[in-house]
Amino acid sequence: MKKLLLGLSLLLAIAIFAVSCSKDDNGNDVVLPGKANSFLTASFKGSKNVKLSKVNDNLTKKEFEVILDNGIKIEFDKDGNWVEIEAVKDVGTIPSEFVPKDILDYVTEHYLGLGINSIEIEDDGYEIELTDGTDLDFDLDGVFIKVDK
């Protein structure tokens, strides 16, 4: 009788576990903050979300990730502010409108012929990745700090 009761308990536990894990988090129920939606609508007219997911990365403050059909990936914080914009899928470069003018001028002057593959805003400034893989750090005012290897 003990074995039967133990067996039924184990079977019930497995059934409950299977039901609770059956719904994968595929992003369909993820809702972006209004500010993020407004940003996407204004900045990427005509592009569609290919993938939307919730990231919850406390270290980098990234909460949401959107990949657009044009190959641009945008990561947002919990309030809907973009924290990283990156060109994926061999797109090459991100639109320059997201890069502060001083940073864009520096890259144009010192890295002729290279584009910006990604920009990430951090608490103390910006990190830029060029199309050749070089990482550059700038302060919040767009002043060059260093090449980050």
Where are these predicted regions, by residue range?
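Positively charged n-region of N-terminal signal peptides that target proteins for export
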Residues: M1-L4
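Bacterial signal peptide processing site
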Residues: S22-D25
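C-terminal motif of bacterial Sec signal peptides marking the signal peptidase cleavage site
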Residues: F17-S20
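First exposed extracellular module after export/assembly in secreted or surface-exposed proteins
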Residues: N28-K149
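Sec-dependent N-terminal signal peptides
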Residues: L6-I14
